[in-house]
Amino acid sequence: MSYPQFGYPYSSTPQFLMTTNSLSTCCESNGRSLSDSAAAASAQTPVYCPVYESRLLATARHELNSAAALGVYGSPYTSTQGYGNYVTYGADAPSFYSLNAFESKDGTGSAHAGIPQTAAYYPYEHTLSQYQYDRYGTMDGSTRRKNATRETTSTLKAWLQEHRKNPYPTKGEKIMLAIITKMTLTQVSTWFANARRRLKKENKMTWPPRNKCSDEKRPYDEEEEEEEDSQKATIKNEKKTVDEEIHREEKALDLSDLEDFDTIESESSECELKQPFHHQPQDGHQLRQRDCVNDHCKEVILKMPITSTATQELDRTKICHKTGLDQCEQDLLRGRQRGGGESKSCFQQQQILDSKPRIWSLAHTATSLNQTEYPSCMLKHQGLSSPSSSSSSSAVSTPVCVIDRRQDSPVTSLRNWVDGVFHDPLFRHSTLNQALTNTTVSWATTKGTLIDSGSLGRSVGNSTNVIKGQLPNLPHDTNKEFIAFQTSGSKMFCS
């Protein structure tokens, strides 16, 4: 009777029938003779005891003990007979053993050969395990190729030829190529890396070099590249626009500085009009004056400046020139018909306008060291004249145009500034101080104040030439003031 369901092919009869004597009695010394041992063995029950190693005996004892504890085996021996659960050798066991080393070695080999193999052992097969793929990623380990052959590389070469512009397969493409070529992912990746290296070495590189990145990542698609280029272009245009705006603002600031500087320097334009020092509003902001006694003389409309902006200053200059020239042309036509002195006076005024006057500058006036270089607007002939002018010629009253109002010269308001900055004795001269104090001048020049250009002379040293503005064709008027114009060279200072 056996129990194959437990994997133990034991029969119902015990394999070991031995006495409960100690194992030491089984192995006795060689001093006893074989006949003595045979006589002792005949007194007991004969036992068949094959030779086992101690390891096998210990295993057998454990298995029998566990089986008896489970109640599978009933103990065939009673306690009166002296048999326990543990198998022991009889007293005369040495009759069955020989202590010869060679015989024991032979017997041990035969004992191993007779042990049957248990049915619970199965040879390991990786296909029956839970993970049906081996570590190389294929179903059958025997079909795995250790080295790439010509057939497998032909497939990879074909794919590389189709993707010469971008020889970087994605993860999915690598898996597909690995299945087709029965290669691993590592082999496919290595092959492509070597192929790219070979093409680069042979200068057959047709793809743009990438930055340092893994082989699993593929470069951007064409659409993504176009979007990236468009974004870069947009950012570049924005930066360019901002730079242009900044440059334009800086240029505007520079131009504004230049305009301010030009406005200061060109305070007096080519026209003989200057901005009034004190603005006094009048009706129509215009002054009308007549040159002659009769009504046949023309009217000259002189626009007085109201604001001090540079743009209006330039406009006033242009209007003044244009108006003066147009009126002179009309007067020339009338003078031909009348043949009087009006054509002559208009022609003389046109000559004065053509000769560009010297720009009257406060800085030049303040820094000039010679008294004769001051313009005539600083000196008033009526009741007061410089010593040089009084010595050279006498004052003669000449009819001039009467102006509706008079403006104070800016030099009188700058007297304190001149006295505070320039401490030269020349500026402290009593005559000059008296002249600066009593100076009053009109800012509007008229056509009637005409000067013969031939009589202009340059004053040298302390001698000055006072130009007489006597007009032959105009009647003498004692109520009019005579203004002495003091010049330097052929260029007239005017205000």
Curated annotation (Swiss-Prot):
Pfam families assigned: Homeobox_KN
GO MF entries: DNA-binding transcription factor activity, RNA polymerase II-specific; RNA polymerase II cis-regulatory region sequence-specific DNA binding
Region (Disordered): 203-245
Record GO cellular component, one term: nucleus
Major place of residence: nucleus
Bias kind Basic and acidic residues: ranges: 235-245
Keywords from the named record: Developmental protein, Differentiation, DNA-binding, Homeobox, Neurogenesis, Nucleus, Transcription, Transcription regulation
Compartment(s): Nucleus
Positions of the DNA-binding region: 141-203
Any single GO BP term: brain development
Role noted for this protein: Acts partially redundantly with other irx members in neural patterning. Required for formation of the posterior forebrain, midbrain, hindbrain, and to a lesser extent, spinal cord. Patterns the neuroectoderm in both the anterior/posterior and dorsal/ventral axes. Does not appear to play a role in pronephros kidney development.
Family note: Belongs to the TALE/IRO homeobox family.
Protein name according to UniProt: Iroquois-class homeodomain protein irx-4-B
Originating organism: Xenopus laevis (African clawed frog)
Taxonomy of the source species: Eukaryota, Metazoa, Chordata, Craniata, Vertebrata
